Amino acid sequence: LRDEEQTAESIKNQMTVKEWEKVFEMSQDQNLYHNLCTSLFPTIHGNDEVKRGVLLMLFGGVPKTTGEGTSLRGDINVCIVGDPSTAKSQFLKHVDEFSPRAVYTSGKASSASGLTAAVVRDEESHEFVIEAGALMLADNGVCCIDEFDKMDMRDQVAIHEAMEQQTISITKAGVKATLNARTSILAAANPVSGHYDRSKSLKQNINLSAPIMSRFDLFFILVDECNEVTDYAIARRIVDLHSRIEESIDRVYSLDDIRRYLLFARQFKPKISKESEDFIVEQYKRLRQRDGSGITKSSWRITVRQLESMIRLSESMARMHCCDEVQPKHVKEAFRLLNKSIIRVETPDVNLDQEEEIQMETDEGPGGINGHADSPAPVNGFNGSGEDASQETVPKPSLRLAFAEYCRISNLIVLHLRKMEEEEDESALKRSELVNWYLKEIESEIDSEEELINKKRIIEKVVHRLTHYDHVLIELTQAGLKGSSEGSESYEEDPYLVVNPNYLLED
């Protein structure tokens, strides 16, 4: 796919008139991004973000050399993590078949020397010679590593240098050499427990070291969720492929067209405009602030490597559209992709009954059904009444709230309390006052008494969680006023709430 000595003009001269017209037509396509994704992976249903990430990896960023001679890589590394049967290996196979210079290997079956390089004795001269490994063979191409998490830790360490510095250094048996490994790495990994646990962070789900994780520009998480519409569409696609292989594959562009376009577009070396520079810095600041703040802990630590990833992805977007300059719209898409790969995992539904369920499990011991808060009603304090005894066998579903909705409510509460803080000296609100204020704010959404009770229950649980779990809100203690036991009891039941001064509001 790559030839450093060629220019866009020389590649154009190698094409026939018809081929060049097709390449030119593709460059003018308003829907090029989507059409390239669907044409490259016609047999894979959905997973659009992964397709976009892999496509940008094929175009790549612009490699640079600083004044001191330090090389900055332009290659984009992508890791796909997910449950079994979510088309991870299919992506790797597609890239391996499409790219002229791609090497496909399995992490479990590859040793450190098999991936980098080995020193062996030549049969004829009996001297030590270097035997190229997968990363060297994929120089100026793509190295697809399946079962990446199954690699031994010492074998993972061997590719640290290749992933960041794009070289492989060898000092074995009197042979000392530094070899090029300018390759993009497309890796696929399975979660530790077999299925992705959305309540844990990405780092806890996969068996990869922190240095390796930071060297990947994009992480994509594929979770096998039961969804009737998606399951039907996937089943239809697979059955169509088995029954009508040729007819079912619908491509806008042929693979040869894409190869020619890729070869032509890769000759562009887009420069970052001043406007885009400022935009990149602004977006990086947003990522860093979000990483250091409250509710969500991102998939991994946001470092300068993620800033470089954003630059490479922006350059790749500009290359794809055959632009000589990186524009803010390219940076925006790069930030969106990077943001998706960082944040997407951290959005499980929030279980607002978590504390009560833990309490029930403790009280019940081995008697309860695992995973269900199904004891009679000790939560409401009515345990033992005849009415509730008849409902003992019915499991009580836990109250869950979508993560985005939980963030929206918490941001609304924080903004209101901070506004009160700015306007008045006595900014603290009682918990009951805060609940009443929120219900008044959403009164247009409430149509019945039952809905009002439900919304009140939700906001009370959210406030409780923000106070005792996320520590976004602080209950003011009544220090030194222990004399009046009656007053202190009412104070404990309905305390004053203020926002934690160290809390940084989410975007």
Swiss-Prot record:
Keywords: Acetylation, ATP-binding, Cell cycle, Chromosome, DNA replication, DNA-binding, Glycoprotein, Helicase, Hydrolase, Nucleotide-binding, Nucleus, Phosphoprotein. SMART domains: MCM (SM00350). ATP binds at residues 45, 85-89, 190. One of its GO terms (cellular component) is CMG complex. ADP binds at residues 305, 308. It catalyses: ATP + H2O = ADP + phosphate + H(+). Its EC number is 3.6.4.12. Residues 32-239 form the MCM domain. The modification N6-acetyllysine is found at residue 329. Disulfide bonds: none annotated. Acts as a component of the MCM2-7 complex (MCM complex) which is the replicative helicase essential for 'once per cell cycle' DNA replication initiation and elongation in eukaryotic cells. Core component of CDC45-MCM-GINS (CMG) helicase, the molecular machine that unwinds template DNA during replication, and around which the replisome is built. Belongs to the MCM family. Component of the MCM2-7 complex. The complex forms a toroidal hexameric ring with the proposed subunit order MCM2-MCM6-MCM4-MCM7-MCM3-MCM5. Component of the CMG helicase complex, a hexameric ring of related MCM2-7 subunits stabilized by CDC45 and the tetrameric GINS complex. May interact with MCM10. Interacts with TIPIN. Interacts with CDT1. Interacts with MCMBP. Interacts with DDI2. Early fractionation of eukaryotic MCM proteins yielded a variety of dimeric, trimeric and tetrameric complexes with unclear biological significance. Specifically a MCM467 subcomplex is shown to have in vitro helicase activity which is inhibited by the MCM2 subunit. The MCM2-7 hexamer is the proposed physiological active complex. This is DNA replication licensing factor MCM6. It comes from Rattus norvegicus.
